[in-house]
Every structure is written in C-alpha cells, then in structure tokens.
Swiss-Prot record:
Any one GO BP annotation for this protein: purine nucleotide biosynthetic process
Annotated organism of origin: Azotobacter vinelandii (strain DJ / ATCC BAA-1303)
Reaction(s) this enzyme catalyzes, per UniProt: (6R)-5,10-methylene-5,6,7,8-tetrahydrofolate + NADP(+) = (6R)-5,10-methenyltetrahydrofolate + NADPH; (6R)-5,10-methenyltetrahydrofolate + H2O = (6R)-10-formyltetrahydrofolate + H(+)
EC number: 1.5.1.5, 3.5.4.9
Pfam families xrefs: THF_DHG_CYH (PF00763), THF_DHG_CYH_C (PF02882)
Pathway info: One-carbon metabolism; tetrahydrofolate interconversion
Single Gene Ontology MF annotation: methylenetetrahydrofolate dehydrogenase (NADP+) activity
GO cellular component: cytosol
Domain of life: Bacteria
HAMAP family: THF_DHG_CYH
Binding-site residues for NADP(+), renumbered to this chain: 166-168, 232
Name of the molecule in the record: Bifunctional protein FolD
Function in brief: Catalyzes the oxidation of 5,10-methylenetetrahydrofolate to 5,10-methenyltetrahydrofolate and then the hydrolysis of 5,10-methenyltetrahydrofolate to 10-formyltetrahydrofolate.
Length: 284
C-alpha cells in the first residue's frame, strides 16, 4: 500500500480563493473588508517569517491588515493597553499575538485580554470552553485546519479510534475536542505516556503533534490508517521533517500529510477563515 497525499497547500489555496470571493462580495455590498491586527514582539527570525506570511495572506484575500512590530523591551502593560485599544476598534475583527513572546511577558494573561469574539487564533479560555461544550465559536486554527483536511479525504470519522500524540494547548488538547465532536474515540498521549507504540498501532487516525522529529515510527502505523503530521522540525542538514517517519508510514497508511505542505498552509488559511467569520457573524 502507498498512501495518498493530503495536499494541504492545494486545499488551503482553494479556501483562500473562497474567502477572497466573500470579501469581494462584501465590498460590492458596501461593507468593509475584515480587519486583522498582528502583534509581533522582538526579532525572533521564525516569528518574523510566520508574520510576513500572514500579512501576505491578508493582502491576497483583500483583508485590512494592521501590523504592530514592537521591540523586545515592550512591557506587559504596554501590550495590554494596545490590546485594549484594538478590542474597541470597530475596524478590527481579529487580534493575533505572535508566539513565542520574550520571557518577561505573560502570554496567558495577554491572550486572555483579547476579546473572545476577536480571538481569531482560538486560544482564549472562553473559546476553548465553547469547543468543549460542543458549541464552537472561534476554533483553534490548526485543529480546525486538520478537520478540513480530514473532510477532504471523504473518510467517515464516526467511531474511528484516534490517537493524538502531544497534549499542547495549541494543538493536542483542542484537537482531541474536535475529534470528540466528530464522533471519534480519542486517546491523547504525552511525554509521560507508556507504550506510545501500542497506542499508535491501534489507531485508525493518528495526529502527530509533539515537535520531535521521527518520534512516530512508520512500523507503528496501522495498515489503512490516516496520518496527520503536524510537526515541522529542521534537522542539522537543513531538511524539514515531521514527527512521523514519512516513507515507512506512507507504505502502510491510506492517507498521509506531507511535511512541509500539509498542515501548515491550513493553519494560515483557517486564521483568515476565523477573521472572516468574526466580521460576518460576530461584528455585524
């Protein structure tokens, strides 16, 4: 068996086209373009790349984008004041604080300061709670994007045994909630899990999101499983690889995401989708 690739790049491009069409229709109706404010603190190279991609995405779909590139010395109070101003700005539908932040800043406090209806990353406790209560409002972008990728396969998720490798607040935990909502039986593994191979090998669906290259061995994959690799790790030789041993896993799985070009593009596209949703449904 050779797995079919889930082309996140192509699916994300299609989603961006749909969003751009919606924005164009809004403009024709005399409505404003959705607005996204992106806050970057410091000069972390990876964060700068991510933010530049997000701003480019906004331009592509016709969003109003506002950039706040702040020095690493920015204080907690200054950031809280900025978020307060953006919360009250009617031209802004979404506020994004790029993580990680400098060590002197409390990310949790800052993310909680964002109004839940402008929390387009979906990290606010209110939005996570809504998801847990089966009433999602603004859903975390990476899990939301993964659900779109899974839908593209045509697979019936009801009753599938799903194993999530990694329990972060950004991916693993909200991913488990999304899968529960979709009717899966979910196991979440983490750094204290014993017999990881056993949990993976019985899964019909594997979501690998631990941030450790090659953690999930191809021989663990159940024949015919769906494998979603969230990890993106740069090796010493410069190659980008996921958390799953791709070649050996692809020989056993039915569907698999590549790295890069799988989950990453969908995360960015879902940020746009959340911002459009906020503009159309929450800020009318």
């Amino acid at each position: 068996m050779t797995a079919k690739l889930i082309d996140g790049k192509a699916i994300a491009a299609s989603l961006r086209q749909q969003i751009a069409q919606c924005v164009a229709e809004r403009r024709q109706q005399g409505l404003r373009a959705p607005g996204l404010a992106v806050i970057l603190v410091g000069t972390d190279p990876a964060s700068q790349v991510y933010v530049s991609h997000k701003r480019k995405d906004c331009e592509e779909v016709g969003f109003h984008s506002r950039a706040y590139d702040l020095p690493a010395s920015t204080t907690q109070g200054e950031l809280l004041s900025l978020i307060d101003r953006l919360n009250e700005d009617s031209a802004i539908d979404g506020i994004l604080v790029q993580l990680p932040l400098p060590v002197h800043l409390d990310a949790s406090l800052l993310l909680e300061r964002i109004r839940p209806d402008k929390d387009v990353d979906g990290f606010h406790p209110y939005n996570i709670g809504r998801l847990a209560q089966r009433m999602p409002l603004l859903r975390p972008c990476t899990p939301k994007g993964i659900m779109t990728l899974l839908q593209s396969t045509g697979a019936n998720l009801y009753g599938l045994d799903a194993t999530v490798v990694g329990a972060s607040n950004i991916v693993g935990r909200p991913m488990a909630l999304e899968l529960l909502l979709a009717g899966c039986t979910v196991t979440v593994t983490h750094r204290f899990t014993r017999n990881l191979a056993e949990h993976v090998s019985r899964a019909d669906l594997v979501i690998a999101a631990a941030g450790k290259p090659g953690l999930v061995k191809g021989e663990w994959i159940k024949p015919g499983a769906i494998v979603i690799d969230v990890g993106i790790n740069r090796l010493d030789d410069g190659r980008l690889v996921g958390d799953v041993e791709f070649s050996s896993a692809a020989a056993r799985a039915e569907w698999i995401t590549p790295v890069p070009g799988g989950v990453g593009p969908m995360t960015r596209a879902c940020l746009l989708e959340n911002t459009l949703h906020a503009a159309e449904q929450l800020h009318r």
